[in-house]
Amino acid sequence: MKKKSLLILLVMCSIIFITTGTFAYYRYSVNGSIIGKTGNYTFNVTSNSTTTKDINLGSNLKPFDKGSFNLTVKLDNTDCDAYYTLKIEKTNLPKGFKFLSQDDNISPFSTHSKYFDGGDNKTDTVTIYWYWDGNVDDEDDNSFIGKTISANIVINSKQTNPAYMKNGYSEDENANGGTEFWNNTYKPYVRTITFDNNLSNLPSTCNEENLCWDISYSQTQNKKVYGYLVDSGLTIEETDSSTSTTVNKSLYNLYIVSEAQTFAPNDSSFIFSFYKYENSKYISNLISINFNNNFNTSNVTSMSGMFYYCEKLTDLDISNFNTAKVIRMSKMFSFCLKLTSLDLSSFNTSNVTDMNAMFYNCVYLTNLDLSDFNTSNVTDMSAMFNGCLSLTNLDLSNFNTSNVTDMEFMFWGCSSLASLDLSNFDTAKVNSMYATFYDCRSLTNLDLSDFNTSNVASMDRMFADCTSLSNLDLSDFNTSNVTNMDRMFADCTSLTNLDLSDFNTSNVTNMFGMFYKCDKLQTEITITGTSITNYANMFSNALTDVNAYVIINYSSEAESIAQGMKSTAPTSNQSKITLKQI
């Protein structure tokens, strides 16, 4: 009787599971196999129009299917300059269905733009890839499996003359911050920036006396771009450095306007970095930027420092940014102290090489979704997340680091990160890991078993202040080229098991404070050669725990060095260090 009841229960459970089908792993019978092109489509569009069309991607599609289609757009009914933008509206699609700019299952397709000069053959073809990611948990998948799936293509075309704006920012000390409103006379006191194509409020005479400037990239372009300031009615108190008296400074709203969509300059470095540094103090009052889809970044190659020190920005909508040509994103959001979130899901980073300090000191960012970042060409990730002390989660599982040479300070100060999966990191070309994990004090575990450190020269402070790490297996580390291990594990107060059995120290010259305040340390290290010249404070304030111990294996020529290292420990703890000649 019990067996019969059990059988009935199992059958009922099976029926419930089959009829609900809400789990990702239930798709066992619908793994995709289609790989191919859906077709070629030609759009003959007129200027100043919106064209919409559904494209059939196929029937009987299943998770993990992928494919592509070509779109050809023709704007041959005008002799004027013209441009078009193409986007895909994601409606009535599975949650895991992606449109991509490359056949890599990663690089998102957001928008595509093309600009034609008057005499051009106004024809453009773009290939769009698609992929149904079956790893995305979606309870509605079953309503799409085996059905026809379509892409809704929207093309906006417009006859125009490009309205390119200049970048008046300057690092020249004699330029006082830059020209026009980028000058330190104005930019620290800009409160809001608004892009618009409404010129009705433009001063009748556009000159500096009226706080108005022609900021067109070229004085010969037909479509002009203007920037003008309007008093917000708000003021701030500031100390006049020349008289030491307190003065009230007016705050302004900046409007950047043109008849047509404003095009960003190729080099947009620090273009919205509206601050000045004076009397050992940063002054910045920018609280919002509203692009209104009137800031076209399709030709931008550098966004370095674009929002540098926008310390009062709490929100930033850059979802319409076209980053397909961008090469440099270093310091892009550095010191955006009050940003709590950033939507970068539409960013195409396939050409980016420099992400140095990209999110440096974004202290209030709690989460950052970079799952669509293509980092295959990035060489510099130094200080990329340095100072992101509120980040609690960071998924870098899709990061391709095969070309990265610099990871200095990469996670320094990410003090709220409890876990970090770097199992997919390729570090074969990295030459510096200086302070890479410094002050990651919430990390309890760190698996670096796949790290290739054969080219690393500096591991200075690499794990310093990782106060919650208790175990660290570095048995696969190749340290043959490392010269600097200064404070490598300093203040790792919880670190007990540390496997350094295969450490090659033959080229190391600096081990200053290497195990400073490692109270619970249990490890064994081998010292060979005579290259180590600085081992001061190596075991200072360390080995206080009753179970702590260190074994120093040394070659005959390194005997005096080993003895000197032992002497750096507190006198009462030197007995916990054993010297063994090899």
Region locations from a protein language model:
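A structural detector for beta-sheet-dominated domains
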Residues: K37-G39, N44-N48, G58, K74-D76, ...
